[in-house]
Amino acid sequence: MELATTQSVLMQIQPTIQRFARMLASVLQLEVEIVDENLCRVAGTGAYGKFLGRQLSGNSRLLRHVLETKTEKVVTQSRFDPLCEGCDSKENCREKAFLGTPVILQDRCVGVISLIAVTHEQQEHISDNLREFSDYVRHISTIFVSKLLEDQGPGDNISKIFATMIDNMDQGVLVVDDENRVQFVNQTALKTLGVVQNNIIGKPIRFRPLTFESNFTHGHMQHIVSWDDKSELIIGQLHNIQGRQLFLMAFHQSHTSFSVANAPDEPHIEQLVGECRVMRQLKRLISRIAPSPSSVMVVGESGTGKEVVARAIHKLSGRRNKPFIAINCAAIPEQLLESELFGYVKGAFTGASANGKTGLIQAANTGTLFLDEIGDMPLMLQAKLLRAIEAREILPIGASSPIQVDIRIISATNQNLAQFIAEGKFREDLFYRLNVIPITLPPLRERQEDIELLVHYFLHLHTRRLGSVYPGIAPDVVEILRKHRWPGNLRELSNLMEYLVNVVPSGEVIDSTLLPPNLLNNGTTEQSDVTEVSEAHLSLDDAGGTALEEMEKQMIREALSRHNSKKQVADELGIGIATLYRKIKKYELLNT
């Protein structure tokens, strides 16, 4: 590296840009490097925070490419990009992924903002969020130029960058100054805390971390957040950035709660607790498909929260202020299910109400109908439901004229409907109508990264409900819980936390002596191979019908056209990578 001989426009405001880099790294959980037009490092984080002001070596081909072409450069797999050929560091490159965005001032590229992954987790983070990060950094770059360079007001306009960054986050964010007064708060945080901006900006606020060692969760920690006469318990991360504290909420524990047994009245996307990759993908998918009127099929084992997902989709849709009607097809006797769904008119049959009855489908008009355990619906009713979906009308029992209905149907099952179709237990044509948008929920055993976060979530849920003191939890207990197979999924974990809240002495720590015997016996056993439920909605080999296979082939072809990575295709379809390659070979899609 060499010292720069002339000071660039970016280098003139280097302290501000360094602050900007640290903010960006904290928000996106990636390394950041910013260089000027002379390839001098203006700012950086981690290993890229060294040698500021010095010119980078000739191996900086990616940065040089962005400067010369004035275009964005993306590398999701290091060493395989053509620009990496001939690089001295190619075989030992620490950069696993790269996203470089040009800083354009008056048609001149004056620098590059780059996001860098140095771990496999960060590499997946970039790949999973590529479009969002690209748009995000491009937007920030525009503001960066217009407010910092053209206005030459670095001191004042850093606030505008802060505000833009946090407003574009789906996490709740609070930023306080060196006097602990709230300086910024984004819409997600306002919504979560139930306050309006004018009632919290400028107010002194206190973050008091709980002291149990085991409360740390992948860098998150429980905090008592207090302002005015209010106190809230929130799990999140607190970052110090040059005189400011930036608090990133993982989730809030004091308002409407995620409940498996009893879903909240108004669930939102952030109440799907989890930060593992599959849960992040699930939340993004729900956000994308919620506005659509198309039918959704939610597939998942018992206890994975299928109704919570259905309610979240409804609350994010344009039907949010309309009815959400839920019915469990397995919980109602077959002879009563038709009248519950379709209703009946006065005198329709012996024992009928004198006034008749409005069916649940009609009650859901203009809103959402959630059909849980759809696989248990009798075949006769399946035909009637199909007619209602296709004609957008229902015929109550005993009625002579149909009633028009406008509903969105979300169905759910923990069964293999493809097998049911092959056995003649489920109508193939109804499956097509209901499975327009398939969503697969992961079992808890595949979410080990989220176990500790969920443990604290349910602990707070039950201590608050039972009026108990919040307990600590020993690290070895958390490890046992991570290794447990959780056949009951979230419902089982919630019930266990309720049990522990009841038996732990007030104010003490939950240790392994309090765990039920079945957890101690099974918690450390190796997990056996299991058939993924996620394949249930896609793997239709056993159905035996050409139409089903054609549908499967089309789904795979369309997914392949949308993604460059087979891993991304498999993730979207909810199947394993080996299964995907098997299907590609079967349907001769190798050149797609």
UniProtKB/Swiss-Prot annotation:
The keyword Transferase does not apply. InterPro entries: AAA+_ATPase (IPR003593), Homeodomain-like_sf (IPR009057), HTH_Fis (IPR002197), P-loop_NTPase (IPR027417), PAS (IPR000014), PAS-like_dom_sf (IPR035965), Sigma_54_int (IPR002078), Sigma_54_int_dom_ATP-bd_1 (IPR025662). The gene is uacR. Disruption phenotype: Deletion of the gene abolishes urate-degrading activity. One of its GO terms (biological process) is positive regulation of DNA-templated transcription. Residues 272-502 form the Sigma-54 factor interaction domain. This is Putative uric acid sigma-54-dependent transcriptional regulator UacR. ATP binds at residues 300-307, 364-373. GO terms for molecular function: ATP binding; ATP hydrolysis activity; cis-regulatory region sequence-specific DNA binding; DNA-binding transcription activator activity. GO terms for cellular component: protein-DNA complex. Keywords: ATP-binding, DNA-binding, Nucleotide-binding, Transcription, Transcription regulation. Residues 567-585 bind DNA. Signal peptide: none annotated. Residues 158-229 form the PAS domain. Essential for both formate-dependent and formate-independent uric acid degradation. May be directly involved in the transcription of uacF in response to hypoxanthine, xanthine, and uric acid. PROSITE patterns: PAS, SIGMA54_INTERACT_1, SIGMA54_INTERACT_2, SIGMA54_INTERACT_3, SIGMA54_INTERACT_4. The lineage of its organism: Bacteria, Pseudomonadati, Pseudomonadota, Gammaproteobacteria, Enterobacterales. SMART domains: AAA, PAS.
